[in-house]
Amino acid sequence: MFSWLKKGGARGQRPEAIRTVTSSLKELYRTKLLPLEEHYRFGSFHSPALEDADFDGKPMVLVAGQYSTGKTSFIQYLLEQEVPGSRVGPEPTTDCFVAVMHGETEGTVPGNALVVDPEKPFRKLNPFGNTFLNRFMCAQLPNQVLESISIIDTPGILSGAKQRVSRGYDFPAVLRWFAERVDLIILLFDAHKLEISDEFSEAIGALRGHEDKIRVVLNKADMVETQQLMRVYGALMWALGKVVGTPEVLRVYIGSFWSQPLLVPDNRRLFELEEQDLFRDIQGLPRHAALRKLNDLVKRARLVRVHAYIISYLKKEMPTVFGKENKKKQLILKLPVIFAKIQLEHHISPGDFPDCQKMQELLMAHDFTKFHSLKPKLLEALDDMLAQDIAKLMPLLRQEELESVEAGVQGGAFEGTRMGPFVERGPDEAIEDGEEGSEDDAEWVVTKDKSKYDEIFYNLAPADGKLSGSKAKTWMVGTKLPNSVLGRIWKLSDVDRDGMLDDEEFALASHLIEAKLEGHGLPTNLPRRLVPPSKRRQKGSAE
């Protein structure tokens, strides 16, 4: 599984292909698209102008869902680490937008400080006001997963009577702003209490136009039995069909994305396969980052072109002296007809036009006399960018990506899916080498319980004093812990990396499993006090 992932020097580095294409996109935007946006006030009607940080930033994943669907737990499951300032509980615990990003030390940065940082891609969030900025923060922590991607945690979307309480800022508009800039949108649903509230429907509507980025996760699926899960899945697909409004079916992943034992383990194999598919999607984000930016720039350019035609048409229809206000009202009322006329005259696809009702509302606040007439040179530059410059970048992107070292998201839960017998591999594939454990003469903390673990070990019928990976897996799966967690335990326990466990390694694995079941975390590397005594001696003599 994930055979294309390499553990070499690519970690933390972006391929040269992405840097080259990204710099070209920045130059094209500044020289050919931005002048048109400024001339026709595109930022006042749609999204504000892009900055260098929008092009240079890491891929971002937006996690959204109703309260208590497991959004924060999902993020902590991916990172295998708690997020600073986060809380987990059945009530709406996340009341703000949290940008989870890499940092050398753990800490949080408040929203007002975040939007003035030129290195972060959040400067254009300033117009949403102080109420929103007080509900926005960045959580920084040293984590290998965050070296490749950033994750946006969102407030729990309210349901029932709670959704009538105002947030004090335009929540759907903020979601739309993030949706335009992220690489992947994950919508979480709770299999145990499936519902789509009015606010959630409005939030999903704000994501319209970005359906290609959306992935749906049916979380907490271990709380229901197989027959109930089938009914819940069918109900979810029916509800999504009503809300999303596209004929295409969204990809739905089913699982239980936290590091606790499965409550109903009947569908364990299904959850494993679904988790692997979702992880592949996330791990591929760094490789496809430049392509996504190119795609989003083309989408933006097409909208800017249509916007220029609309604004210039309204300017042309305005009288020079009298009756300006009445004419403005007439033009806004006739906007659907104007859209159809522009579409036929300039041979533009209906999908390139903005939402007519929203455009009518925005136009009410603008002075049409300050609009500009059509500037053919600006439009020619835009058409040249779409027809010539972007087309030249496509083969360059493909060629340079082939020549570059492919790097994916590593660390956290992604590491556990590739460890020992818990990795999906072909029959001839060998277990990958891992990092060696530490050595020390300190007392082994597992000794006091080793007799208990030895009884289990010998009942599993080891061959030549060692337990094979398949036998160990059968026993470990019985603990109902997720495969990604068991994979990390295997990596820590198989100290000599021979793909089998001797009595000491098995005792170590049992100790780590018990610690995890009691709610403790797993170490990133094996601490010196946990390294089996015989392995310390072997390593010492080898040196």
From Swiss-Prot:
Detected in lung and adipocytes. Detected at lower levels in heart and skeletal muscle. It is a peripheral membrane protein. Residues 320-340 are annotated as: Mediates membrane-binding. GO terms for biological process: cortical actin cytoskeleton organization; endocytic recycling; endocytosis; plasma membrane tubulation; positive regulation of endocytic recycling; positive regulation of myoblast fusion; protein localization to plasma membrane. GO terms for cellular component: caveola; cytosol; membrane; perinuclear region of cytoplasm; plasma membrane; recycling endosome membrane. Residues 153-156 are annotated as: G3 motif. Ca(2+) binds at residues 494, 496, 498, 500, 505. Residues 449-537 form the EH domain. This is EH domain-containing protein 2. It comes from Mus musculus (Mouse).
